[in-house]
Design a protein with these regions (language model features):
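N-proximal low-complexity "stem/linker" segments adjacent to membrane-targeting elements
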Residues: 1-31
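Short acidic, S/G/P-rich loop/turn micro-motifs used as interaction or catalytic elements
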Residues: 15-20, 47-49, 107-110, 136-137
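Acidic donor-binding segment of Leloir-type glycosyltransferases
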Residues: 31-77
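Glycine-rich, basic loop-to-helix element that forms the pyrophosphate-binding segment
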Residues: 79-95
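Short beta-strand-to-loop acidic/aromatic patch adjacent to the donor-nucleotide binding site
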Residues: 99-109
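Conserved catalytic core of nucleotide-sugar-dependent glycosyltransferases
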Residues: 111-191
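Acidic donor-binding loop at a coil-to-helix junction in glycosyltransferase catalytic cores
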Residues: 195-202
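Single conserved hydrophobic/aromatic residue that forms the stacking wall/gate
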Residues: 205-214
Length: 214
């Protein structure tokens, strides 16, 4: 049974530059669709849509729910060499109609309870912003293969990922749950950061503290 995250929208900006990134995009999207009743917006910015050609057919084959029920895919054609992640995020934030928006990285999978606890904390008005991991703790870097992620998706057993992972620092983490109104009122993402970089995540965390939204 899927957990109810119906008042959350996961916004996932992507540019698929490698087979590893393609695998990660498929894995994280399938994981969210299979485990949560939620909303997803994926926006790909590139010359051509790798997601539409390579990922969508696989997702339609392996995911056992109607993937189009609460899923929106957008491709914006662009020849820009830099992936302007913050601008893409802001465009997707403005599309959100749910109480919670999740700035979500396509390379991240969290323990299932991390999603539900973050969601509940915001819906219960305990928090405005939740970082499910990070803050000086650690993350697991997974050396995934197609076989590994297939077994994980089929069984939901995190041990398949743990077996091929190592501990690594996580800083502020690449996934944040926001109360949507707070995210918008706070100015959303700083588009002066024009590429994919950890400074942008650190800035978001610092701004949340300075405005009292933590």
């Amino acid at each position: 049974m899927r957990a109810d995250l119906s008042q959350a929208t996961f916004i996932i900006p992507i540019r698929i530059e490698s087979p590893d990134r393609l695998r990660n995009v498929i894995t994280t999207t399938a994981f969210l669709l299979e485990n949560f009743d939620t909303n997803i917006i994926i926006q790909e910015v590139d010359k051509q849509s790798v997601f539409e050609k390579e990922a969508l057919p696989i997702l339609e084959d392996i995911v056992e729910v109607d993937i189009w029920k609460n899923f929106n895919f957008i491709h914006k054609k662009s020849d820009e060499p830099l992936f302007h992640r913050q601008r893409v995020l802001n465009e997707m934030i403005m599309e959100c109609e749910t109480d919670i928006v999740v700035n979500y990285d396509c390379d991240v999978i969290l323990p299932k309870e991390s999603y539900t606890l973050a969601y509940k904390g915001i819906m219960d008005n305990i928090y405005d912003v939740v970082y499910p991991y990070g803050q000086g703790m650690f993350q697991k870097q997974v050396a995934a293969t197609d076989i590994t992620v297939s077994k994980f998706l089929e069984t939901g057993d995190y041990e398949f990922l743990n077996a091929v992972s190592k501990d690594h620092t996580s800083d502020f983490g690449w996934a944040q749950f926001f109360k949507t109104s707070v995210y918008k009122e706070g100015g959303m993402e700083n588009e002066n950061f024009k590429a994919y970089a950890p400074e942008a995540v650190s800035y978001t965390h610092l701004r949340a503290h300075e405005t009292g939204n933590d």
